[in-house]
Amino acid sequence: MAAAYERGQHKLCSQRRLSSTRALSSCVASRSPLYEWHRAAGARFIEFGGWEMPLQYSGIVEEHLTVRQAVGLFDVSHMGKIFVEGPTAHTFLDHLSANDVPTSPGKARYTHLLREDGTILDDVIVTCLAPDRFLLVCNAGPRNAVWSWLKSHATADVVFLDRTLERLCLALQGPRAPELLQRFTSVDLSRVKLFAGVTIDFVPPAPWGARPRAVPPEIEGWGKSDLSGIAVPPARDPSVASGRASFLVTRTGYTGEAGFELFPTAAEGSWVWESLLQSGVDLGIKPIGLGARDTLRLEKGYLLSGQDFDGHQTPLEVNCAWVVKWGRPFIGRKALEAQRTRDDYPRLVGVRMEDRGIPRPGHRVLSRGVDVGHVTSGTMSPSLRVGIALASVDRGHAAPGTSLQIDVRGTPHAARVVPLPFL
């Protein structure tokens, strides 16, 4: 099954993969500071959101199961990292956000940035670093659109800093991720709750005794007031050669497993990456590519920007009504209220295959031969060993238990609507 699955994933990604020297030279794509490490490790690359990123190392199925069973390390530095600062930064972001933006330092929240017509510009995570300082993590593809959207609504006392190229985002994910990261810090990570975080001291298990280093100014002092009792490390000297670092860590991820996302500087990134991989050998750690990241998120029913929503859907249409906090003004609210009242919009549902068919994006969804929707994301689940999909279907065919068919290359395959997540 694994070999067939890999072939299917390769075919699916063939239009985007950078598979030749000529393709690489002609493509204007950003690269992570870890690019050379990935290349030396034998990674296969793909163009994603304007970035050349590793698709896989040892294989998508193996990497997927590593994260479910042990611990994996992802380079997701293509994610946009925009700091929003100023005395009215919270009011500004809250007006652009469908969900409440957190006010307590160290709290993070998943939300949608909406246009006036209620459609989703992007789904993002906003972390409060201080009452007047926030970090907005957006997707790579819409990053420029998000930046322009922020600037177009800016007020005089709000400042934006795009640190995407200056900071990495490393996702340490899996049931043994907390155990591994705890080896590097004196901060009690068991007290960092989901969608919260802290600035950690990052020191490899040995040797200690390095000089202090300075915390970058955009996160100076963050984490000291929101997580009572958690120790925050003293300032450090900026030299990576000292064997220490201090950076932002949030308990977030895109896999549904325990884990953290780390935001070291570009200068610190390779050292942090290699230190985690070396220290985690006994825990079964492996580097993980975007291929497994996609299958992991799909098993949990998480949305993929540009695929499950592409600029034409509202939160109500992608199973995210829970994101919307109606008791406050925000851009797009009136349009959403009107849509909610009409209740005539398509629904995004989970679909599980009942035979060996593998659903793929764009496949049509049928009910007794009548077209009722389409697949937005689909794959063979490495954990469940069955085809699964997210599909946009009309309201009358969205209830769990509804029998459907997926048209796979002209052949209808039996499927059924199931509750999310799949796993």
Predicted stretch roles:
Residues R16-L18, G209, I230, R236:
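Short linear segments in intrinsically disordered or otherwise low-structure-confidence regions
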Residues M1-C27:
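N-terminal mitochondrial targeting presequence
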Residues R68, D123-V124, V249-T250:
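Short beta-strand/turn micro-motifs at beta-sheet edges
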Residues M1-E6, H10, R213-V215, I219, ...:
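Short, low-complexity, intrinsically disordered N-terminal modules
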Residues L24-L114, T119-L121:
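Acidic, proline/glycine-enriched N-terminal capping motif
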Residues H95, P102-S104, H112-T119, I125-A130, ...:
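Short, charge-rich binding segments
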Residues A23-G49, M53-L55, C128-W208, P212-A214, ...:
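Conserved, structured C-terminal
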